[in-house]
């Protein structure tokens, strides 16, 4: 019986991080967590990481789609935060989620969902590196594993 599992180390992976500027004080913490995980656990060279900034979470799927279409990356991490009450929460959160999932399916590329969808600012702060861990770091871990799984499945 063959079992395929993803390792965390992916030193040659080419990773694009698409990050929203809206709520940047939260998103920058997510970015720090993702970069730290890619470097320390994934052993990904900073030369293989590209950071692409866009206005907000609603724009993440389009930027991720164009990034995937370029065929220059093995995986994409999408980072952002949508806080209920600050925007049209349901629309932005839903379209962001659906759009990023569609990019992964259309282009056969892992797209890690590191977008916080929370009710309160305090929840976002907790999930960006305090009480509830760092969801940017968690997205990077998922991405590293998926890069290795897809490499095995495709070979």
From Swiss-Prot:
Signal peptide: none
Active site residues according to the UniProt entry: 88 (proton donor)
UniProt GO cellular component terms: cytosol; riboflavin synthase complex
Translocase in keyword set: no
One GO BP: riboflavin biosynthetic process
UniProt entry tagged with the keyword Transferase: yes
Keyword terms: Riboflavin biosynthesis, Transferase
Binding site for 5-amino-6-(D-ribitylamino)uracil: 22, 57-59, 81-83, 113
Gene3D superfamilies: Lumazine/riboflavin synthase
Reaction it catalyzes: (2S)-2-hydroxy-3-oxobutyl phosphate + 5-amino-6-(D-ribitylamino)uracil = 6,7-dimethyl-8-(1-D-ribityl)lumazine + phosphate + 2 H2O + H(+)
An example Gene Ontology molecular-function term: 6,7-dimethyl-8-ribityllumazine synthase activity
Subunit structure: Forms an icosahedral capsid composed of 60 subunits, arranged as a dodecamer of pentamers.
Function text: Catalyzes the formation of 6,7-dimethyl-8-ribityllumazine by condensation of 5-amino-6-(D-ribitylamino)uracil with 3,4-dihydroxy-2-butanone 4-phosphate. This is the penultimate step in the biosynthesis of riboflavin.
Family that this chain belongs to: Belongs to the DMRL synthase family.
Protein name according to UniProt: 6,7-dimethyl-8-ribityllumazine synthase
Organism: Photobacterium phosphoreum
Source lineage: Bacteria, Pseudomonadati, Pseudomonadota, Gammaproteobacteria, Vibrionales
